Design a protein with these regions (language model features):
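Transmembrane alpha-helical core positions of polytopic small-molecule transporters
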Residues: 20-21, 44, 114-118
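CoA-thioester-processing core
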Residues: 1-42, 57, 68, 72
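Helix-loop "lid/cap" segments that line or gate small-molecule binding pockets
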Residues: 42-43, 90-94, 107-112
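Hydrophobic alpha-helical segments typical of transmembrane helices
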Residues: 26-29, 38, 83-86, 104-107, ...
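Acidic, divalent-metal-coordinating active-site segment for phosphoryl/phosphodiester hydrolysis
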Residues: 46-53
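C-terminal long alpha-helix characteristic of the crotonase
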Residues: 4-9, 55-103, 115, 132-135
Length: 135
């Protein structure tokens, strides 16, 4: 879902040097995540995508050290589980019509009728961090 990497990280899929083919989903996913030029450089020219290149196109969330990565993971883990599940379902959908799939719509409805949404409103009113339970 999210990629966190330090400044020395790099990414490479050496299919051309190994002589095998990639499925269409993987090729198009690389294009969507990296952009056409970087995906071509990585797949066709067998080039590494550096952390700075990956960060520039939003492929990674750059961090300076493991502690910063852990802090980021901790902050994400504190977010509302139902909202996260609905967002991930909608973001991963293959439908380009901008309509929510039936699964994403059901999760949307569950999120808005959950106790988590009530807790978020209450916590905001009380100026405190919400405590989510995924219900």
């Amino acid at each position: 879902d999210l990629r966190v990497a330090g400044d020395k990280a790099w990414f490479r899929v050496p299919v051309a040097s190994l002589g095998f083919a990639l499925d269409g989903w993987t090729i198009h996913r690389a294009q969507n995540l990296l952009g056409g030029a970087l995906a071509r450089n990585m797949l066709i020219a067998n080039q590494r995508v550096t952390a700075s290149q990956a960060a520039a196109v939003g492929f990674i969330i750059p961090v300076k050290n493991p502690a910063q990565a852990e802090e980021f993971a901790y902050e994400v883990s504190r977010l509302a589980p139902l909202a996260m599940q609905q967002l991930k379902t909608a973001l991963n959908a293959q439908d380009a019509t901008y309509q929510l799939s039936a699964d994403a719509q059901a999760l949307f409805d569950a999120c808005w009728s959950s106790t988590d949404i009530k807790e978020a409103k209450q916590a905001r009113a009380e100026r405190r961090a919400p405590i989510f339970h995924g219900r």
